[in-house]
From Swiss-Prot:
One of its GO terms (cellular component) is ribonucleoprotein complex. One of the early assembly proteins it binds 23S rRNA. One of the proteins that surrounds the polypeptide exit tunnel on the outside of the ribosome. Forms the main docking site for trigger factor binding to the ribosome. Part of the 50S ribosomal subunit. Contacts protein L29, and trigger factor when it is bound to the ribosome. One of its GO terms (molecular function) is structural constituent of ribosome. Belongs to the universal ribosomal protein uL23 family. Keywords: Ribonucleoprotein, Ribosomal protein, RNA-binding, rRNA-binding. The keyword Nucleotide-binding does not apply. GO terms for biological process: translation. It comes from Clostridium acetobutylicum (strain ATCC 824 / DSM 792 / JCM 1419 / IAM 19013 / LMG 5710 / NBRC 13948 / NRRL B-527 / VKM B-1787 / 2291 / W). This is Large ribosomal subunit protein uL23.
């Protein structure tokens, strides 16, 4: 279904909460909604060259927004919180952000 690992990982989540979790080697990403935990784990290990201990996922429903009489909806997305093993190195992309 996926041609490569970059199709699964969409973008990192940079928030105050996700930055605090980086001390525990937990990194948060927006991922493809159809990807499962095994595919996400394989993609993170392949792209960043780290060892993943576990993956927690959650489907986030987009909020309903309105401007005047027009009603719209933000897109739904899937969020993955990836915990690395103790002996694994940190993901270089996030270094210097703490």
């Amino acid at each position: 279904m996926y041609t490569n690992s970059h199709d699964i990982i969409r973008k990192p989540v940079i928030t105050e909460k996700s930055m605090a979790e980086m001390a525990d080697k937990k990194y948060t990403f927006i991922v493809d909604p159809h990807a499962n935990k095994v595919q996400i784990k394989k993609a993170i290990e392949e792209v960043f060259g780290v060892k993943v201990e576990k993956v927690n996922t959650s489907n986030i429903l987009g909020k309903t927004k309105r401007v005047g009489v027009h009603v719209g909806k933000r897109a739904d997305y899937k969020k993955a919180i990836v915990k690395l093993t103790e002996d694994s190195k940190a993901i270089e992309f996030f270094e210097g952000m703490q």
